Amino acid sequence: MATDGESISMSLAVATCVAMALFYVLILYVPTVILRLPSASSYTEFMIRRFICAAICTVASLVFTAFILPIKSWEASYILGVYGIRKDHLWQGVVYPLLLTSLVYAGSLVLKLFTLLESWKENGGGCSSFNYIRSFFQTIPASVLTSASNVSVWRNFIVAPVTEELVFRSCMIPLLLCAGFRINTAIFLCPVLFSLAHLNHFREMYIRHNRSYLRASLIVGLQLGYTVIFGAYASFLFIRTGHLAAPLFAHIFCNYMGLPVLYANGKGLVSAAFLGGVVGFVLLLFPLTKPLMYNDSTNDCPCWLGYCLWN
């Protein structure tokens, strides 16, 4: 293990990051290709296998990263802090990045409001609307229980965001920064590696969903473009705040919302809201992610904390 004053080589950092990205994808095929297990009998079993593989990859990446980084203490709180897992300034690390991210979805949120109002009108307003609202809240417990047993919900909102942010943000960014890469380079290099973890979607589209080669390429190409953009934003949040919670909750929110709605037929306000939200996002990007809002000090930081260099 290196000491706190040492650094790591750029070649070692890049090789480690590439290896972790490939491992994150290839381990998904271990059950059938290497262990020779029979094909999953159900979608639930298939996803549970993938959850286990992703968890193993994540733990291995965290341990390997800890031995490469110039860490001076093995105390749990110190190690967790290296990965951005902290309890101090937690509400700031969740709320402010979520508010910032929601600005990009202003059009989507306005469209949802229109849908809610139309539903209210269809129910006649007044007492009928209160009955509708009461009925809605009564269905929440059942919806929660249904979601808790839905593997797709676990994949989209728990397993994928947590494992991806731990591997591609908590592990890779400290490695790149301690290797001497510039902050901007780390921000845009991680998303490229992040997109590699989604290349297996082409196989799923082409083989499992029986898409044509061209259609599968277009769909996956769009997904890769989106993951690169989001990955850069998530890396930006992680470096600026020093909090894993910032990109993690932004990731979950984006998975829930999907692609931002740019326009809707007959609803010009949706487009106006989207444009206004984008302008607000650009204007508030740096003010809402000031390092001092999320940290007690921005001086004398270890090499893996980039916010000291970007205060």
From Swiss-Prot:
It comes from the Eukaryota. Belongs to the peptidase U48 family. One of its GO terms (cellular component) is endoplasmic reticulum. Expressed in seeds, stems, leaves, flowers and siliques. It catalyses: Hydrolyzes the peptide bond -P2-(S-farnesyl or geranylgeranyl)C-P1'-P2'-P3'-COOH where P1' and P2' are amino acids with aliphatic sidechains and P3' is any C-terminal residue. Protease involved in the processing of a variety of prenylated proteins containing the C-terminal CAAX motif, where C is a cysteine modified with an isoprenoid lipid, A is an aliphatic amino acid and X is any C-terminal amino acid. Proteolytically removes the C-terminal three residues of farnesylated and geranylated proteins, leaving the prenylated cysteine as the new C-terminus. The substrate specificity is only partially overlapping with that of FACE1. CAAX processing is likely required for subcellular targeting of prenylated proteins to the plasma membrane. The active site is at E164 (proton donor/acceptor), H198 (proton donor/acceptor). It is an enzyme of class 3 (hydrolase). Its EC number is 3.4.26.1. One of its GO terms (biological process) is CAAX-box protein processing. The chain crosses the membrane at residues 14-34, 51-71, 94-114, 173-193, 219-239, 244-264, 268-288. Pfam families: Rce1-like. GO terms for molecular function: endopeptidase activity; metalloendopeptidase activity. This is CAAX prenyl protease 2. Inhibited in vitro by L-1-tosylamido-2-phenylethyl chloromethyl ketone (TPCK) and N-ethylmaleimide, but not by EDTA. The keyword Zinc does not apply. Keywords: Endoplasmic reticulum, Hydrolase, Membrane, Protease, Transmembrane, Transmembrane helix. The record marks H251, N255 as: Transition state stabilizer. It is a multi-pass membrane protein. InterPro entries: Rce1 (IPR039731), Rce1/LyrA-like_dom (IPR003675). It is found in: Endoplasmic reticulum membrane.
